C-alpha cells in the first residue's frame, strides 16, 4: 500500500545520483557500485524506481517470513508469531523504509539474513555444515553487506569472528 501511495518510491539525493549512474551506464564507487548494479539488474526487466522498491518489499517480506518460521520451529507460539508479523507489517517505519531507494535498505535486509543464518546455526549446530548448500551460502551471505555498504566490513569480520567463537572444537580443518 505504501508503494502505491508514494509511487514510484522515495528517493534522496544519493538515490538520484545512483539512478543517473544506472541510467547512463556510468558508474562511480562513491556509492558502492554493487548496489547500483543491483538496481540496474532489476531495471533491465522494468525500468522504474518502483521495480526496485517492489523487489525490496518482496525480499524483506520473504526474509522476515523465513525468520518467523525459524522462530516458530524453536517453539515460539503461533499467536506471538502472528502478532510479530502484524506489527512488522503495519509499522510506519517499515512501510516507508521498504519503499525508499537507499543502499541502507538492502544492507538491512542482508544483515537480517546474516542473523537468520546464525539463528539456523544455533538451532542445528554442526549439522548446519553437513549440507553443501549451507557451506556455499554462508560466506556469500556474510560478504554481501560489505558489498552494499563500506561499513559492512564490520559485519563481515564480526560474523566470521562469531563463528570462530561458536565452534571452538571445529577450528581446525582436516585436509583428509
What are these regions (language model features)?
Residues 134-149:
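Membrane-interface alpha helices of multi-pass inner-membrane proteins
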Residues 5-18, 26-38, 42, 46-50:
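Extracytoplasmic catalytic/substrate-binding loops of multi-pass membrane glycan-assembly enzymes
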Residues 99-106, 148:
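Short acidic/glycine- and proline-prone juxtamembrane loop motifs at membrane-interface regions
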Residues 67-90, 108-109, 128-129, 133:
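Transmembrane-helix signature of polytopic, membrane-embedded enzymes
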Residues 151-166:
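Transmembrane-embedded, aromatic-rich helix segments that form part
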Residues 23, 66, 106-126, 142, ...:
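Specific aromatic-rich, kink-prone transmembrane helix
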Residues 81-92, 116, 142, 146:
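Short helix- or helix-capping micro-motifs
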Residues 54-75, 113:
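Transmembrane-helix motifs of polytopic, lipid-linked glycan transferases
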Amino acid at each position: 500500500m505504501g508503494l502505491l501511495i508514494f509511487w514510484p518510491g522515495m528517493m534522496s539525493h544519493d538515490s538520484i545520483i545512483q539512478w543517473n549512474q544506472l541510467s547512463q551506464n556510468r558508474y562511480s564507487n562513491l556509492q558502492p557500485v554493487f548496489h547500483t548494479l543491483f538496481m540496474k539488474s532489476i531495471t533491465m526487466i522494468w525500468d522504474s524506481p518502483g521495480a526496485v522498491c517492489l523487489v525490496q518489499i518482496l525480499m524483506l517480506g520473504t526474509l522476515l517470513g523465513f525468520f518467523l518460521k525459524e522462530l516458530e520451529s524453536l517453539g515460539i507460539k503461533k499467536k506471538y508469531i502472528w502478532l510479530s508479523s502484524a506489527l512488522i507489517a503495519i509499522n510506519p517505519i517499515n512501510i516507508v523504509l521498504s519503499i525508499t531507494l537507499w543502499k541502507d535498505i538492502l544492507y538491512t535486509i542482508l544483515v537480517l539474513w546474516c542473523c537468520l543464518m546464525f539463528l539456523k546455526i544455533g538451532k542445528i549446530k554442526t549439522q548446519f555444515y553437513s549440507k553443501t548448500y549451507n557451506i556455499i551460502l554462508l560466506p556469500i551471505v556474510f560478504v554481501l553487506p560489505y558489498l552494499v555498504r563500506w561499513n559492512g566490513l564490520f559485519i563481515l569480520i564480526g560474523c566470521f569472528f562469531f563463528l570462530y567463537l561458536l565452534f571452538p572444537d571445529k577450528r581446525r580443518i582436516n585436509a583428509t
